[in-house]
Amino acid sequence: MAQKFKVMKRVSATCSELPDQVFAELIEELGFPALVDGYEDFDGAGASGPTIEISTGQMEKLTMTLKMLGNHSDLYAVFRKKAVWTFTGVVEDEVTGEKVPHEVTATCRLGGITPEAKNRTGLHKHDYELKSIMAADIVEDGKELFGWAWGESPRFAGVNIEAEDDAILGLV
């Protein structure tokens, strides 16, 4: 089987609070949610040997970042509002040329707007932070890579990795 070399080429963004706008060619950077499992150090309470990490069973908070060229004054009206943001990218396999969609959807708040300093010759940019993410889905070519909503267990590659725990706790 040939190795794949997939690269995201282009991306667009939409916000449910601004239904008539699509942000596309102005996106310079997009920071997708980092999936980080929570761990705590355990030193063995005096036992010899190295400190070990124990999974807490909790993921770290999800955040996203966005850097766009220009001044988007309409986004100030969305600041602190709960909205559904959708980011759609074109992922191309550099080996085969096959293109597939990559979509990230997050129910969250626009929690940060940081204008960069404007210099005389460069383009003005703004950094945006999406915070208080209460639901997130990452889907590539119709396949769920990650899915989660507040009060639900996370799914990785479409599988609830906490299904056994949920059953023991009577959550299913």
Regions found by a protein language model. Name each.
Residues 1-39, 158, 164-172:
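Polar/acidic, low-complexity leader/linker segments enriched in S/T/G and N/D
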Residues 52, 75, 94, 113-120:
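Catalytic micro-motifs at enzyme active sites that drive phosphoryl/nucleotidyl and oxygen chemistry
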Residues 52-72, 122-135:
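Oligomerization/assembly interface segments of phage tail-like spikes and tubes
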Residues 56-58, 79-81, 98-100, 120-124:
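A generic structural micro-feature
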Residues 70, 76-104:
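Short, acidic/charged, Gly/Pro-enriched secondary-structure junctions
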Residues 108-172:
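Mixed-charge, glycine-accented linear interaction segment located at domain edges/termini
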